[in-house]
Amino acid sequence: FFYIPSGSMENTLQVGDRIGVNKFSALFTEAKRGEVVVFGDPDKWLGDAPVSDRSSFVAKIKSGLVTVGVLPDPAKQYLIKRVIGVGGDNVICCDATGKLQVNGVSIKEPYIYKGDKPSDVKFNIDVPKGFIWVMGDHRSASADSRFNTDSAYAGMVPLSKIVGRATLIVWPLGNLDYISKGSDLKKVPVKKLP
């Protein structure tokens, strides 16, 4: 399970939500457009990892839960974002109507935080094989691929950094729900890589 610490994925995910993540899917299939994925920080997008006090009783319990895989390792910083582009895709912001385009197809994004634009940052990128381009649903509050183009991977996330696909909000119970996959992105034609 993973904890949502920020509002970068609102309104799909709320601060404090706990989500179920399918880690096995990342081992056998590549991420698809529209999926919400958890991934390890590819190049210090979050800055340096926080130092924790391991001497307290609670810290020892948490450490044990990390060891058996129930909790994520806090020393490994994780992010959660929506996959917009996969290897071979061309992603552009924005078309004449202000929508993102993937492989020349303008997409509807009903999951974007109300009042946000698809992006205030213009870009035209080609996603290389073995990488994804990700964006938070709360575009004005998400430090995602758009804001990390000067990093080692030019804002892309290597597939090897993906921990799994977010599938279900499990806590609080009032938020219990499946996580949407962005159906409009499924309509985008696949570009064949040479």
For the regions a language model picked out, list residue spans one by one.
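Soluble "head" domains of membrane/secretory-pathway proteins
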Residues: 3, 11, 15-194
